[in-house]
Structures are given as structure tokens and as C-alpha cells.
From Swiss-Prot:
Assembly description: Homotrimer.
Homology family: Belongs to the NCLDV major capsid protein family.
Source lineage: Viruses, Varidnaviria, Bamfordvirae, Nucleocytoviricota, Megaviricetes
Subcellular location: Virion
Name of the protein this chain belongs to: Major capsid protein
Superkingdom, natural source: Viruses
Function: Major capsid protein that self assembles to form an icosahedral capsid. Represents around 50% of the total virion protein mass.
Pfam family membership, one: Capsid_NCLDV
Principal place of residence: virion
Keywords for this protein: Capsid protein, Late protein, Virion
PTM comment, free text: The N-terminus is blocked.
Species this protein is from: Simulium iridescent virus (IIV-22)
Gene Ontology CC, one term: viral capsid
GO molecular function, one term: structural molecule activity
Amino acid sequence: MSMSSSNITSGFIDIATFDEIEKYMYGGPTATAYFVREIRKSTWFTQVPVPLSRNTGNAAFGQEWSVSISRAGDYLLQTWLRVNIPPVTLSGLLGNTYSLRWTKNLMHNLIREATITFNDLVAARFDNYHLDFWSAFTVPASKRNGYDNMIGNVSSLINPVAPGGTLGSVGGINLNLPLPFFFSRDTGVALPTAALPYNEMQINFNFRDWHELLILTNSALVPPASSYVSIVVGTHISAAPVLGPVQVWANYAIVSNEERRRMGCAIRDILIEQVQTAPRQNYVPLTNASPTFDIRFSHAIKALFFAVRNKTSAAEWSNYATSSPVVTGATVNYEPTGSFDPIANTTLIYENTNRLGAMGSDYFSLINPFYHAPTIPSFIGYHLYSYSLHFYDLDPMGSTNYGKLTNVFVVPAASSAAISAAGGTGGQAGSDYAQSYEFVIVAVNNNIVRIENSLVRNRRRWSREGPMVMVC
């Protein structure tokens, strides 16, 4: 058997090949020496996680409530919602064809809307649809399992239980949702809370009710009937579920006295990201296979996320496929055989011009995210069109000002699978009864926050229809 070998002398042969191309690529007064590392010093700081204080409301299913952002820390880096999901038992008196489970992406869908306000003016917002899109295109595979555990995609919550079975565990299950507000994107855009003593800062939540999140099915109901059943307290479950302890945690940076003094001394403009969600519109491929939707966004749009949501079951919030999930015993198949993307191709029109003409869904689900997003979704039905070279990058890398455009339309042409499933003729479980859909589109835009004289004020009004520039 021969032994592997090499020697240092052979490396000098490589060094001797230096020529014109190498002169262009290597050397010069600004060249980097990879073997003498320079230390990039930072200012002195530490970081500490703390729970935020409740301000208004009751943190419960179906309620609106808020927490106050403390100014005790210098910079707000990240925030996350921590919720205890209670155990729920399906009545043992029911037939064995019944099963109960929580909806997929439970922590996403618990949030009807979350906002951050400065003196009651909304600076940023997001909803469950943005949470679905954002995580699908930004959470890498190496973190996906951990993220799923945080948001409730665990077997003890989303796998169906038979009569007498219990979802969750005694004492409840603690779930965590990272809140993707603009200040959490990078430490360079952290919210300088210590420089804002005259602003009342709040994070506000609107929670969905439990019956919008729990799913009861009865397999004895066969097509053309749907297997979904409305839950009745006292018949199917003994009592309405009640959330356990709910907290909002914040990670703060504490800086030196010198840096703290400088925070309020100069005007500072911060480039931030905001989310706009267009009103959802019914998508009926049986009667109109190529509907035209008018979308009205504003500001510098860097990315568009869109999908057709399958709303056959109102509580299946995160289903963007042609078929409904299929329950078999103690398991559920969220993408059963015969489940496809409801959209075949999409046309984007503005200024009476086809910006994109009948682009196939493979472009929006595979090609565009391959080049312009951190990751490609592993789920059916997610679509991205990025104006930015890399939409996850904080630096401006491409956008279009939708406030300057007129007559913006999106035309998502239905796939043959969507047409068949809408008529209940899909031929496979999950699409063998009539499916119903709605069109969802979300935009991410850039905007500017100005901090001056210890205040954040608005030059133009922030609104749900379009966030405006917030300056002081």
C-alpha cells in the first residue's frame, strides 16, 4: 500500500506562477494579509434579557393587550413572545372517528396582529401571514427544527389525539416567538431606548381566539362533505382552553456612560423595514381561473410575498396548497398526494405594462429565492418576488417606490390542481371535496426613522394602508 505524501518545496512552484492576472488580483498597498489579523475593537457593553411590564389588557385568547418598552436599557436588540399553551383533552364519550389537534405554526397564527407604537402612532406591524412568509424564506435549514419547536410544530400539539387523548402536557407547553420588528434585524438598527425619554413606547398584540386555532375532525364524514367539525364546549372538550403565563421578553444592550451621553447629542436617521399586508381577497378558480387583484402599497418596496391560502378549514391558517391536510390515525399529512401549488403562473402589471408576464410559480418559489433570499421554502405554495439583490440585507440593494406607481395589479393564474380541488374533483384525499381559497400578498418596504432631541415624532401619519416616514 502506498503512503500519501507532500512537501513544502512544491509550494514554491505555485508562488513562481505569478503573472499579469495575479498582479490584478493580488498585492498593492491596500492588500489584506490573511496571516496577520487585525482586531476590530468595539465600544464597551453588555447585554441582558428582561421581561417587559404589562401595560393594558389581558394576555388571553381573543384579547388585545400591550406591554411597555422599558427605557432602563440603552438599546433594544430583540424581543420575543413566550406563551404557555394549556393541555386540552378530547372527550372520551365521542366515537373513535374524532380527532383533535392545534393548527400548524401555532405561535404565528395566535397573532392576528402585532404593532409597535410611539406615543400611540404605529411605527411597524406584522400579522400571521408575514410570519409564515418571513420564516419560510429566512430561517435556514440548520435552525428550522429549533424554530419549529419554538412556534409549536411539535408532535404533542399538532399530531391529532383520539377521544380521551390530551394535546400538550400537564402544566402546559412553553412556546416562543421571535418578534421580527425592524430593530431586531441587526444591532446597527437597534432601538436607542435611552435616547427616547419623551416617547411612550409599546408593543401591542391582538390574539386570535382558541376556536380559531383548535381543529376537530371526524373521519366518518366522507366526501363530498368536509371532515372538519365545529368545536362545542361541553360536548367535545370540557372547558374552553385558557393560556398559561404570557410574557414578552426583551434583550437590551447596556453601554458605557460615555456612549450613553452621545446617544442624544446628534440627529440620527435609521433605515428600517416595515410590513404591509393587502386585504385578503377570495380566489375562486372554478369561476375565474385568472383573477386580477388591485394592490395598493406605498414606499420603497424591496420584496413581495404572495400565496393562495386554502381556507376550507378556517383554522388551517398556514395551508397554501390545493388540498386540505389528511388525518390518518395519530398523524396528519399536511401535503397529501395530489396536493400542489394553487398558482400556475403570475403576472405583475403596473403603468399599463407587464412587469412580469405569466411567470411560472417555479420562478417565484425556487429561482427568485435561490438568488435573492437566505433559503428556499420546503413547503408548497410560497412565492417571492424580490426587487432587492438580497432582500434580507439591511443595505439598499434595490427597490421600487409603489407610491409613485398607478394601476398595480397581480394576476395569479390558477393551476389545474386548484381548479379540480375547488370543484371537489381532485381525486385524492384532501381534495376530493370542494376546497375554498383566498389570495394573500405581503410587501416589505424601507422607511426612515429620525431621532432628534430625545423624541420620535411623525412628519406624516402612519397608517395601516401605508406606513409613513417617522421623523422628529
